[in-house]
């Protein structure tokens, strides 16, 4: 018996058409609302659902690409307290966290980003650092952060 899965189950993934035994379909999949019978009406319903999901996917991907272009034009700069040690090495006394970067992006540029999207965030060196921001699935932006010594 052919069925269209509504949710992920042992038979397969959501929106997949699978062949299962009649007993498994009627006694388990239909009763648990995991599948619907395969027929022309339900096939049309499945095509509509897949088309809507594709549209939503394309819209999210487009928004992520727009945000990526905005982020890659931005250069953030911070000042950290630092001192020169006797051996000539600069010793930094504080660091820049994800919270600092997100606050700066929101206040100065009006961009709100989830804090879990940031990678390699803990910055405690003077100079230029790259922050990777995961925007959507395989779309990533690189944000440049310049850290200067505060006098």
Curated annotation (Swiss-Prot):
Carries keyword Nucleotidyltransferase? no
Record key words, sorted: Ribonucleoprotein, Ribosomal protein, RNA-binding, rRNA-binding
Pfam families, per the entry: Ribosomal_L9_C, Ribosomal_L9_N
A GO term for molecular function? structural constituent of ribosome
PANTHER family, from UniProt? 50S RIBOSOMAL PROTEIN L9 (PTHR21368)
* Protein family according to the UniProt entry: Belongs to the bacterial ribosomal protein bL9 family.
Sorted alphabetically, which NCBIfam families does this protein's record hold? L9 (TIGR00158)
Descriptive protein name: Large ribosomal subunit protein bL9
Q: Which organism is it from?
A: Mycoplasma mobile (strain ATCC 43663 / 163K / NCTC 11711) (Mesomycoplasma mobile)
Instruction: Give the source lineage, highest ranks first.
Output: Bacteria, Bacillati, Mycoplasmatota, Mycoplasmoidales, Metamycoplasmataceae
Tell me what gene encodes this.
rplI
